[in-house]
Amino acid sequence: MRVADFSFELPDSLIARHPLAERHGSRLLVLDGPTGALAHRQFPDLLDYLRPGDLMVFNNTRVIPARLFGQKASGGKLEVLVERVLDSHRVLAHVRASKAPKVGAVILIDGGGEAEMVARHDTLFELRFTEEVLPLLDRVGHMPLPPYIDRPDEGADRERYQTVYAQRAGAVAAPTAGLHFDEALLEKIADKGVERAFVTLHVGAGTFQPVRVDKIEDHHMHKEWLEVGQDVVDAIEACRARGGRVIAVGTTSVRSLESAARDGVLKAFSGDTDIFIYPGRPFHVVDCLVTNFHLPESTLLMLVSAFAGYPETMAAYAAAVEHGYRFFSYGDAMFITRNPAPRGPEDQA
């Protein structure tokens, strides 16, 4: 299976660089995986596709203002993008500078703050700050907008590049399917008899890294930390018992649940995952998916293709482009029912 199979033409004008005025104001492309049928709706119409007894699983990670600007004490500007918070004072981070800082180098943070480079781990730098990391980031950090948004972060991004139910700080990218939900819509979903549960997956900057191999089977995913609690396992078992569907809000929720069920049995799990879901891999937990539109040749598009079927997914994306849907993090959304017999690129006639 080749990465190029997942390419498609996307006009630059369809990349959403700012959020809409209202979270729920986006459009919703509904894809019935078993038939490939499409319906063009508005996001609040998601209610029409939910049933009493269903369970929606959300990712409650909270995006941290992970981008810092500063300079080495010896001179030279640099940019720091925190990848993972290790403890109250230490992080793993990407550092962009004309010359990489050496062990022992001191970094002076714009706005106040100081860190020392204490170790290097492949492409990541371990930094130790002189004050607690999370309060420092809240004070002087910038929201880590994806590279395709291609603009400086603004004050509004602190609210809008964050779900309304975000709780556990640690992500450097938003679980963007959740950005469409406001409190009023969540209340209507609950009123319909739909249950909810929360997993945590701290999305890393690697989610934006391109696939650099020709065959997708040769690709190795970056690691991200997740937690699926026993309460989630119990909620899913109860959902199954009453005949409900498990609806994942976002690919991060899918990856969390399927990581916790890698042997086919869902169990509570806390730790790193590098799960890579592409056509041919079975799903053990998720029945339906709410997700945004993803980048060409991305691992997330491959995940959607595994869920809905490759020809159905690529046809849906072609329809989305034709109808002017907005793409990527601040863009529109899809609601997908899983295809029980998905085909891959090699199965095309």
From Swiss-Prot:
Pathway this chain belongs to: tRNA modification; tRNA-queuosine biosynthesis
Top-level EC class: transferase
Localization in the cell: Cytoplasm
Pfam families on file: Queuosine_synth
One GO cellular component term: cytoplasm
Coiled-coil zones: none
Chief subcellular location: cytoplasm
A molecular function GO annotation: S-adenosylmethionine:tRNA ribosyltransferase-isomerase activity
Chemical reaction(s) catalysed: 7-aminomethyl-7-carbaguanosine(34) in tRNA + S-adenosyl-L-methionine = epoxyqueuosine(34) in tRNA + adenine + L-methionine + 2 H(+)
Keywords from the UniProt entry: Cytoplasm, Queuosine biosynthesis, S-adenosyl-L-methionine, Transferase
Any Gene Ontology biological process: tRNA wobble guanine modification
Entry EC no(s): 2.4.99.17
Gene3D superfamilies: QueA-like
InterPro entries from the UniProt entry: QueA, QueA_dom1, QueA_dom2, QueA_sf
Role noted for this protein: Transfers and isomerizes the ribose moiety from AdoMet to the 7-aminomethyl group of 7-deazaguanine (preQ1-tRNA) to give epoxyqueuosine (oQ-tRNA).
Family, similarity comment: Belongs to the QueA family.
Subunit structure: Monomer.
Protein name according to UniProt: S-adenosylmethionine:tRNA ribosyltransferase-isomerase
Gene that this sequence comes from: queA
